[in-house]
Amino acid sequence: MKRLTIKTDRGDFSVCFWKGPANAPILHWAHANGFNGQTYNRLLRKLTRDFNVYAWDAPGYGMTEKGAFYNKVNPVLGNSYDLEALIIELNKKHKRKILLGGHSIGGSLSLMVSKYIEEKISGSVSYTHLRAHETSL
């Protein structure tokens, strides 16, 4: 796992990156409330057999600070715009559609974003009852 900073028009986001095969699909994983991207290390590193995996730290979690665009009235809506900006940058970087996944609110954010920018998304997966620290594949 490697930490990266990805710059977007809504600020800088700290993301975890697990490298998979050279031409593997790109998966972005969005964490649940109270977690950060690195929480899912045990799960996501195993997915590198088939994917290049990114997992962000949403604003105010992990290593991403609440930026100028942080929406304290409706943080879920604000985070959906932040995630959209991040996915647009990943799409530009890799020049292909991104598969979105997430746990709990991260899954909901991923579904919201997939509707905003469906032309940049290859699909989405949402998990509600995942205990990431105990997950084994």
Q: What does each model-identified segment do?
A:
Residues 1-4, 16:
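An N-terminal hydrophobic leader/cap segment in hydrolases
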Residues 9-18:
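A short loop-to-beta-strand scaffold at the N-terminal edge of the catalytic core in hydrolase folds
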Residues 18-66:
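Conserved HGGG/HGGXW glycine-rich cap/lid loop of the alpha/beta-hydrolase fold
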Residues 22-23, 49, 94-96, 119:
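Active-site acidic short loop of glycosyltransferases
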Residues 128-135:
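Conserved small/polar residues in nucleotide/adenosyl-binding loops
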